[in-house]
Amino acid sequence: TYMEILAPHIAKKAQPGQFIMLRINEDGERIPLTIAGYDREAGTVTIIFQKVGYTTYALDELNEGDSLLDFVGPLGVPSEFEGLKKVCVVGGGLGVAIAYPQAKALHDMGVEVDFIVGFKNKDLIILEEEFNNACTNLFVMTDDGSNGHKGFVTAALEEQLNAGVKYDAVIAIGPLIMMKVVCDLTKQY
């Protein structure tokens, strides 16, 4: 689920790589969510979440104009991207929501970005148009081949590396096993 929240004080200071903590009501737990985007002029912060527990289901039930009990941020250390000319951002599963602001920030800075995103199937694909606008080259992978190319994001990265594509950095966000394979693939480069 994609949600914009009016929070001018957070939107004003937000940077890629940071997150917020929110709590819906007195009975709710505080949960961290990555800042997927922000609009300083509109004063909005965008979050993306999957309904997996009480808090995210309750969050999904909110309507425009409803309020949250707590919405704190930006928290965390912003990502640093200085001196990069060509980067590959790899996002798998829920990690794509976190990878998106990284790719967008780099692309907005004039960095050439190859963005590899992976999903289980076409029904779980989110933000494809936004991804397309946040990179130079977009590679969509699905485990079952129902959209884009069939296979894992690591196969697309390996194909790029084997083709001689050189990156100043590779940023991987997703399941631990995916990030480990990305690290193993890039060690020799």
Feature names for model-found ranges:
Residues Y57-Y189:
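FNR/FR-type flavoprotein reductase catalytic core
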Residues T1-E64:
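Ferredoxin-reductase
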